[in-house]
């Protein structure tokens, strides 16, 4: 479903933990990382689409999260032609998104990346609030900036972005392995079937994006 200008209605999700860190997912069998997002189906409200996408991409249910805020208006980004599948070129321009800020009230082990037969992510991690601006693919960066900035006013303690000239920063908490502090972050893992106190690690971030179809 596209609007008259060729933008697909979509929702984006910024999921916070208790430390104001954000959920960051690695796309299935790819090296690109992003926030959960997905299209709004015909007849759905943005909130209904958000809860559906949240479950499809993270396995979380409404009782696992609390809505903190949402963007006032649609935020748009255009997708470069080289990333658009041939069959939709000339019709599809990009996404227009309503962004939701959620607070996770469940546990890390409630996250299940295999909640559906068509998972979007194969690994995940918690990142500091502003880190995605330095890591997301360039054509989404302006929308991420707008969404993160607008929604930061809802945080318990406003997240201040620092070191703007520097690249992606490590998570605020060190990753642990076998109960001991690790000297390096371990490879990203899927904690879908595990409930423990060990936080997921992360791979090096890669900005190589997938080609976009209308289901993204």
Swiss-Prot record:
Domain (Nudix hydrolase) ranges: 6-149
Q: What class of enzyme is it?
A: hydrolase
Q: Which Gene3D superfamilies match?
A: Nucleoside Triphosphate Pyrophosphohydrolase
Q: Which cofactor does it need?
A: a divalent metal cation
Keyword terms: Hydrolase
Span list, region Disordered: 159-188
Q: Which InterPro entries match?
A: Nudix_hydrolase, NUDIX_hydrolase-like_dom_sf, NUDIX_hydrolase_CS, NUDIX_hydrolase_dom, RppH
Which cysteines pair up through disulfides? They are none
According to the UniProt entry, its GO molecular function terms are:
pyrophosphatase activity
Motif Nudix box extends across 38-59
Q: Does the keyword Glycoprotein apply?
A: no
Q: What is its EC number?
A: 3.6.1.-
Q: In which family does this protein belong, per the annotation?
A: Belongs to the Nudix hydrolase family. RppH subfamily.
> What does the protein in this record do?
Accelerates the degradation of transcripts by removing pyrophosphate from the 5'-end of triphosphorylated RNA, leading to a more labile monophosphorylated state that can stimulate subsequent ribonuclease cleavage.
State what protein this is by name: RNA pyrophosphohydrolase
Q: Name the source organism.
A: Burkholderia mallei (strain ATCC 23344)
């Amino acid at each position: 479903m596209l609007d008259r200008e060729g933008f697909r209605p979509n929702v984006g999700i910024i999921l916070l933990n208790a430390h104001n860190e954000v959920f960051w997912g690695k796309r299935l069998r790819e090296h690109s990382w992003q926030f959960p997002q997905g299209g709004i189906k015909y007849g759905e409200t943005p909130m209904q689409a958000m809860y559906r996408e949240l479950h499809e991409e993270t396995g979380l249910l409404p009782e696992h999260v609390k809505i903190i805020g949402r963007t006032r208006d649609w935020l748009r980004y255009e997708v470069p032609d080289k990333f658009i599948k041939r069959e939709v070129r000339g019709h599809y321009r990009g996404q227009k998104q309503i962004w939701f800020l959620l607070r996770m009230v469940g546990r890390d082990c409630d996250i299940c990346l295999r909640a559906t037969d068509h998972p979007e992510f194969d690994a995940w991690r918690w990142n500091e609030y502003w880190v995605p601006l330095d890591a997301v693919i360039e054509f989404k960066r302006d929308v991420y900036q707008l969404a993160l900035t607008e929604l930061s006013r809802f945080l318990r303690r406003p997240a201040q972005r620092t070191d703007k000239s520097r690249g992606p920063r490590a998570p605020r908490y060190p990753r642990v392995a076998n109960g001991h502090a690790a000297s390096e972050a371990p490879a990203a893992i899927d904690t879908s079937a595990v409930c423990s106190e060990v936080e997921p690690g992360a791979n090096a971030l890669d900005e190589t994006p997938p080609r976009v179809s209308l289901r993204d």
